[in-house]
């Protein structure tokens, strides 16, 4: 364990994307977090974009969806992504941002529009981040789907999605190639609720030194 990351979340996710005053508070908070991470010798943020409470990136759960289109929300959220990244880089220009989920989760169900995805608007926020990020910024798609992975083929397929397929899902493909890396999260006591966590017989755990 050589690197430290400060965890930051999007919860509770109740802030209105179009509320400038509220977003001023959000940006101030992340600016403070960036200073703490930098001065604390952290590599950067572990940015958990999972919607544990409200659907911050879900168009169907936006309070102004009856008066503003998906594209209008996308444009505003892209702006917020730029503002967020600029504020963070102001205090931490060489930050590494680990994302629990990247562009893949923003994709729509097959045959449907991105507006129907529960994380559809996340892609716009990430686009804004890429547009504004400093040359030294690294963004890592840490691919939470990999928590239970054991097989190399699973990692290979995920790597291809992050490094090749996801380039097609951003409006900033060149900056994506320059700034985005692949990284896989592993949940060491994965499935402990189902199989428990055995300290005497490691072979009974999802992950074992034998596998």
Question: Where are these predicted regions, by residue range?
Answer:
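Glycan-processing catalytic domains of CAZymes
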Residues: 1-211
């Amino acid at each position: 364990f050589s690197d430290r990351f400060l965890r930051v979340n999007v919860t509770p996710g109740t802030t209105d994307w179009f509320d400038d005053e509220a977003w001023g508070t959000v940006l101030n908070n992340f600016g403070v977090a960036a200073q703490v991470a930098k001065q604390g010798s952290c590599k950067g943020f572990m940015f958990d974009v999972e919607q544990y409470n409200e659907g911050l990136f879900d168009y169907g759960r936006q309070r102004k969806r009856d008066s503003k289109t998906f594209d209008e929300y996308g444009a505003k959220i892209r702006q917020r992504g730029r503002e967020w990244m600029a504020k963070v880089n102001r205090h931490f220009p060489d930050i590494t941002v680990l994302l629990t989920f990247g562009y893949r989760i923003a994709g729509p169900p097959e045959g449907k529009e991105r507006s129907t995805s529960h994380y559809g608007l996340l892609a716009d926020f990430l686009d804004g981040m890429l547009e504004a990020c400093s040359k030294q910024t690294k963004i890592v798609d840490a691919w939470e789907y990999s928590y239970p992975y054991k097989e190399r083929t699973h990692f290979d397929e995920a790597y291809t999605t992050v490094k090749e397929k996801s380039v097609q899902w951003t409006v900033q493909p060149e900056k994506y190639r320059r700034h985005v890396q692949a990284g896989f999260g592993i949940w060491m006591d994965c499935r402990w609720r189902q199989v428990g966590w055995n300290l005497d017989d490691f072979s009974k755990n999802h992950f074992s030194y034998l596998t």
